[in-house]
Amino acid sequence: MTERADQATETPVEPAPPHHTKKPSLKRRPPRWFVAAVTAIGSIQLLTMMDGTIAIIALPKIQDDLGLNDSGRYWVITAYILAFGGLMLLGGRVGDTFGRKRSFMLGVALFTLASALCGFAWNGGALVSARLMQGVAAAVIAPTSVALVATTFPKGPWRNAAVAVFSAMTGIGSVLGLVLGGALTEMSWRLAFLVNVPLGVLAFCLAGAALRETQKERMKLDVTGAVLATLVCTATVFGLSRGPEDGWLAPIPVGSGVIGLSALIAFILVERTAANPIVPFNLFRDRNRLALFAALFLGGGVMFTLMVLVALYVQSVMGYSAMRASVAFLPFAVAVAIGAAASARLVRFFSPRVVLIGGGSLMLCAMLYGSTLTRGASYFPNLVLPLVVAALGIGVVNVPLRLSLIASVGLDRIGPTSAIALMLQSLGGPMVLAVVQVAITSRTLAMGGTTGPVKSMNEAQLNALDHGITYGLLWLAGAVILVGGVVLFINYTAQQVAHASQAKAASDAG
């Protein structure tokens, strides 16, 4: 990334807040412009985070209602994540170039329209297409939201309050998506998408009234690079999803592989010659940072795939309702928070590598235990025990990964580096899920099962699905072992991470 692009991303304009000139204080009631701006940015951030998980709980009902096979079922969530993660870096550049308020409002309008189309989808193709549109919109909204928090609110109490709200919406969005998805799916899975429409309209109106346009920084957009990166992942996932059913030498899997490989080669060539590349390759020259990026990619994939498999298992195999399935995830959310809190203390005394291996060991044990489950297993303690242990491990590994990221580049380049890390973490989800799904589908078919809707399965086919999903957990355990191997190359010390933590805290304080 060029120096000019870095400055455009990380040196925000400091507009004076509308309607007052005195130094702001939170001791008095916040002004209307502040409430409107925070509501606009915070609510749409919540929706984009929710939509990464809200469909997970609804998947079995969507599959039964629309008659999807296993491949089609997973594309309902994969389409959103691929578009979101693959185009996120380009979305941030669009805001810098054409104005963040304008880009934000365009993204909100597109997201709201796509949500309505999801709610009224008449078949699987229409739903996947609308989810793809949602992901494109979210890829514009997410980075421009971050920038708008910095440019809309002046340094001091108001910005700190806005950052707190924004961070809270980001943190609870994924968990709320699981819980709210279950409650809404009990009535209709379509409500899980239609709930976005009124909130999207509200955010659009408030943004138009309260947000101010930022200065535009004309720069060459690397559209080709962003599209090629997304195409690489999409073609790979599509080929992997069709291979077990069609045969690996069938035209679609082979063609997808050729397209993915060709797109990867083209992406490397484009990024090496681009004036303003979407992915600066110089960030990958450091071994520590390269290992860190790989760990974020695989770790994000493990967490995402685990949530999908658990949601599928408790509903399709154990027969839980959507609401009961969402409640089953509550201990998971609590355990992640506890693990993160414990990890924040552990990194003061141990190197990130030690903490990461400890958290990964918890995840590995949980998945190995989960792979032994059978249809007759009860939620407590048979399912909740490995679920909580895995969640503790996820919480533990998240903190040293984030702090190591800051230690790898320093605060002066944390903006573009964090953006690439978030992209890799997002794309890891559908990529790891696609590989694990190959194992699940192959095992299910080998045991006499089917890839059709669960409502049409007999007892033998349900047993085959049970064995397939638990076999998939073994593959997921293998992914955790692979992460552990990558982590061995991360050599940051506890002192470096402590310094990064202090620098980040000072920066967040303004």
Residue ranges of predicted features:
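Transmembrane-helix bundle of Major Facilitator Superfamily
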Residues: 2-209, 350, 371
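12-transmembrane solute porter fold
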Residues: 34-50, 55-57, 70, 251-259, ...
